[in-house]
Amino acid sequence: EVQKVTLIPRGQARGLTWFLPGEEDPALVSRQQIFAGIVGGLGGRAAEEVVFGEPEVTTGAAGDLQQVTRVARRMVTAFGMSEIGPWALAEPAAQGGDVVLRMLARSSMSERLAADIDAAVRTIVDEAYEVAKAHVRRNRAAIDQLVDVLMEKETLGGDEFRAILSEHVDIGKERRETAARTQQLATA
């Protein structure tokens, strides 16, 4: 659930979206939930391509691309969530951020398995990117309105974000009512 959206630069990021933690059990995450997170992570890059065209895509999504690739690789190598099958293909120590351990794990597998892993990761990310672009195209009017408001205010709270979004898409009764109450308070 979105907590805040801002255009104000933070570190290397030119704008950010903060999410509230979900109510689901973080120890038990489904393939669908992980894939949805990858789709969301590719949203900014997808929006650039849909709105401005592929030649105008910027480096702004570099961190997002690293993150979604890392998550997709874990889907394949740690969670068995690919066409390769339900196998753990790397030792747990090689799943973390240690580059040397990852390189050693990769050197211990066959070239074909390494290529299969790379192909499975690419398939997941490519499919998620197509879904992200479809979401952007389908919700272009909402995105354009959010951009207009963000250009004016620079930052939107989660309820204000949902109030604008609910004018274009069904976000569920409970979220719609909360957003409407917040919008009424903001305009009163």
Locate the predicted segments by residue.
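Soluble catalytic regions of large protease machineries
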Residues: 1-188
